[in-house]
Amino acid sequence: MVNRQPPTLDLLSKSPGAHPPRTQVPGSAGVENRKSKDFLFLQLRDLPYFRAFLRAVESSYYQDLPLPVPVYDVGCGDGHFASLTFDQKIDVGLDPWHGPIHEAKKHGAYRFLVEAEGAKSPFPSEYFSSGFSNSVLEHIPHIDAVLAETARVLKKNAPFYFCVPNTRYLSELSISRFLGPGYTDWFRKISRVHHADEPDIWEERLARAGFEMKQYWHYFSPSSMRVLEWGHYFGVPSVVTRLLTGKWIMAPTHWNLWLTKKYVSRYASPEPVENGTFTFYIAGKK
């Protein structure tokens, strides 16, 4: 039976919209997460706002989830997300992209970084005690192979957390109402999303790979999704800044970002919503 709400103290919430409290695994050493952090500002000072406010929501979820060590990050990218989300280093970050994973060294969020395909992990079976993949799996064409390999390197009953867009990521696009499916297909391509699926599809994928889906909840409302959509266009100046200076934000200060933060904060709620455009999953290795 899959629980469709975020975890509460007993991990079985019956209160819709309840934000998960902090949990621990008795007797298991794990990664200590950042508490009482302003994740929205921390993300805004480094990223374009349309990426920052979604990542801030996702950072908040990990504060409530146990991550017994060693921890495996599938698709760590440039390491920015982990550096802001966790107080202690993640044991291993794996990514196939040469540029981002070498940039991850600068953030210092990992004990070890491995440049490799997620479907060909160099680690022995049942090596890791927990794993996560933050907004990565939707970009992987060979998703079944990556999930199966992730299951192989996780210990029995190890938790695996991931978040991905669902079907409403595409169906709630505002410009599609005027330009039709051609725009939807184009947006899917520029955002490199191969899988925008509902929980039943993910449950089947997980089962084939050797996981059991434990929980999920939808988040990021349709209105938030449309702010993200338009941010791709309003964020063009940030792209120019990045190309010229290597930074997304020239003045990452409170006074420079307060108006942006004030605007996006109303769309950056971590509360689960039934028609959310993204879904957070908790799975367990069988």
Positions of the model-derived regions?
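Conserved class I S-adenosyl-L-methionine
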Residues: 161-184
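Conserved N-terminal segment of class I S-adenosyl-L-methionine
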Residues: 2-124, 130-132, 273-280
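Acceptor-substrate binding/catalytic loop of class I
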Residues: 183-201
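Short N-terminal helix/helix-N-cap motif within the alpha/beta-hydrolase-1
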Residues: 140-145, 172
